[in-house]
A protein has these predicted regions:
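C-terminal substrate-binding subdomain of Rossmann-fold SDR/epimerase-dehydratase oxidoreductases
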Residues: 23-25, 31-151
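NAD(P)-dependent short-chain dehydrogenase/reductase
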Residues: 1-29, 35-37
Length: 151
C-alpha cells in the first residue's frame, strides 16, 4: 500500500471494527484533500477566467493538514470507543517524513478563488455516513487524496 492509504483505511476500519492500526506515527502531518474538493478544484480551474490565471500550468491546491491522531479524534467524536493503534512501518514513515506537511495554495486562492469545502470534521461526517450506507468491504467512490504539487 501507499504511504497515505491510512487516511482512507482508517474510516473503513472504524466502520468495520472500531479500531485501526496506523503504520505512521500518530503525529505525522501530511497535506491532504477530500476527493470531492479535488474534483471541484479541477473543474473550477477549467472554468476560471483565463485573464486572471498567471500560473497557467501549475497550481497547488490543498485543504487540510492531517495526522493519524487528528483523524482518529474526529472519528472518536462520532464512533465512541474507536481505538487507534500504532505499529510504525519504517519505510512508509521515511517517505512521509520526506513530504511537506503543508502546501502554499495562495496563487489558486487569489487567481481563481479556490476554497476547499471540506475540513476534517465535514469530511469525517461525510465519509462515515457514506460508509455506513454501503458495504464497507467495497471501496467507496469518495476517497482522500494527498494534495499534490506540480513543478
Amino acid at each position: 500500500g501507499g504511504t497515505t492509504d491510512y487516511a482512507v483505511a482508517i474510516y473503513f476500519e472504524a466502520v468495520r471494527h472500531r479500531r485501526y492500526c496506523s503504520y505512521l506515527r500518530e503525529d505525522t502531518a501530511l497535506a491532504m484533500m477530500y476527493m470531492p474538493d479535488a474534483l471541484r478544484a479541477a473543474v473550477e480551474l477549467m472554468e476560471a477566467d483565463p485573464q486572471r490565471l498567471r500560473h497557467r500550468n501549475a497550481y497547488n491546491v490543498t485543504a487540510m493538514t492531517l495526522t493519524p491522531r487528528s483523524i482518529a479524534a474526529a472519528i472518536r467524536r462520532r464512533i465512541a470507543g474507536f481505538v487507534l493503534d500504532v505499529a510504525v512501518d519504517p519505510r512508509r514513515q521515511a517517505i512521509a517524513d520526506s513530504w511537506p506537511d503543508s502546501l502554499d495554495d495562495s496563487a489558486a486562492r487569489r487567481e481563481w478563488g479556490w476554497r476547499p469545502q471540506f475540513d476534517l470534521e465535514t469530511m469525517t461526517g461525510d465519509m462515515l455516513a457514506n460508509l455506513s450506507k454501503t458495504d464497507p468491504t467495497q471501496k467507496d467512490s469518495r476517497c482522500l487524496v494527498t494534495s499534490w504539487e506540480n513543478d
